[in-house]
Amino acid sequence: MSAKQNFEEVWFAGVHGDIGGGYPEAQSGAVKIPLAWMIKETKPAGLLYRSRTVNDIVLGKSGKKYVPLDATVPLHDSMSVGWKILEYIPRRVPENSWRKHGSRSAIYFPLSDRRFIPDDALIHISVKERKDASSYDPPNLPANPHFVP
């Protein structure tokens, strides 16, 4: 018999590389937040982690070459010049787009649209920390966000 499976979708601040990694270590304070969250969430399922490795690489506690997680570090802009040009090419409105809500047009210009975040979405508490510490105020954040640790 297979084990029960479940998942939880939690939203974090940043572009793809700010969430999944790929930037140099010195610019990786934001990516450590979802990584720490995934480690915390998967431990109860039996995944094992070396505490020293997590403390060094994720939490930056060793004082070595790894930066600690930080909700207030600058986020990246993944819209390169080439990508921005592509944003002016008309395309179909995706089914999960906020544009589907009340839109009658099947075609639109992306123009760097932000993702639609549902009202009942779980938003990581680090987004609130970023908002409280700076002028960060994403227009697609629900009016009454549900923040989770």
Segments the model singles out, each with a brief description of its role:
Residues M1-P149:
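Active-site- or binding-pocket-proximal scaffold segments within functional domains
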